[in-house]
Structures are given as C-alpha cells and as structure tokens.
Amino acid sequence: IKCRGQVVGGLHARPEYNAPVSGDLPTLSAFPDHIWPSLAVRDEIQSRLVAQFSTDFLRRHWLIAFDGAQIELAWDRGEIVGVLGRAEIDELELELKSGEASALFGLAAHLADLGGVRLGSQSKAQRGYRLAGLGKPLAVQPLPDIGGLDGKACITLGLQLWQHHEQLWLECGKEERQQALQGMLQGCDLVAEAAENLAQAPAWLPALRVQQRLLAEAGEEQLSALLHGADLVGLQLAIAAWLHLDS
C-alpha cells in the first residue's frame, strides 16, 4: 500500500507498507492497523475490492552501499494489463533504505551517465489506471497559472510540465508530437525564467540553456536520442536534487 506523498522530478517520498499476497486480491488486515481511518472502514474496503488492472513483472534487486547510504536498486521487467491494452514495464527503481537523500541522487547520476535511461514521471499505478479507463489520458497540458508563486514553486511546476510532455511525446502519435514538444519547451522556459530571477542562479542553469536549444533544434530521431541522453537526464536529476536537497 502506497500512501499519498510528494513527487519532485521523479523522486517519490511517501510511506509504503508491504505484506505477502497469496492470491489476486490483498488481505488488508495483513497491513498495520494504524494506516486505516478505522478497522470498520478497512473491512468495508476489503469487501468492495475489485481488480482493475494487473502488473506482472520480474523484479531483480540489489542492496548497494553508496556514499554512506544503503540503497536498494530494483530492476522490473514485465507488463501492465488493463481492459484498454498492455504497456511494457522496463524500469529501474532506487529506494533509500538508510542514509542521506543526496546519496540517492548521486547513484542516480552514475546510472544516468551510462546513457539509455530517462527519469519516469508516471508510476505503474498511474499507467495501470489509464489502461483500465479510470485515469486521465496523457494529453497536452496548458501552462499553469504561476501568479503569486515563488521561484522554487515555479521551477517545480516547470519541471513537471516538461516531464509530462516528454512522456506524452514518447507515447503519442506523430500528429501530436509537435504539441508535446512545445509543452516540453514551455516547461523548460518556465524553469529557466524562474531560475534566472533567483537571488543566486543555480549551477545547472547554463546546462539548461544548452538543452533548451538542442530540444528546439532537434529533428524527430535526434529528439528521441536526446530524451534518453546522459546530459538531459543528468540535468533533470540536478534540478530535482536542487529542489529536494535545498528545500
């Protein structure tokens, strides 16, 4: 059971509870009592549980000692299945078991340097709900209203807009890709403009300006390579780390 938390640039910070499952439906009484509003509510939820989608994947995991921290690296491969179709799972997850969050970003940066990976902004659950027809489809999002927001809040919104449209570009048809690219560039612009107005410009700002230009000038094949390139992924990680560690 994953509870509500905070997501910043691909870093999910939230309480999570695990229990063995012997069939298709979980036994909610196997989870801690304190996570429920009441046991009566828990039992009512149990009686109404219906499977909406399934995730079927093989997980390999390793415990890594890195920069004074213990980090679990999990590699999941499989698929998500819902009434609207299937989607591939092929992802790496890093979970901080002990130590400082800075180590988590450090290890992620090492993985990004290898190339061929990107930060995923959509969880398995979000993708599953879409395949079940219960979630909002991926679509172009307008530039949010930023009136009254401080610089860090604007950078957070800009990064979310950028990553949302990056995912859309990778999944949508050719006719929507230009709109998705414009959404990415709007997100980048929002991040850059907010960063420029801070009292002290972040160290990642020059790299962002370079990536903005490359994204704007890239053809379709070049853009796909850029989105999985070490430089762009490392930049997103640097922004996410700045938001998380400096907040």
Predicted feature residues:
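Function-determining surface determinants
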Residues: 1-247
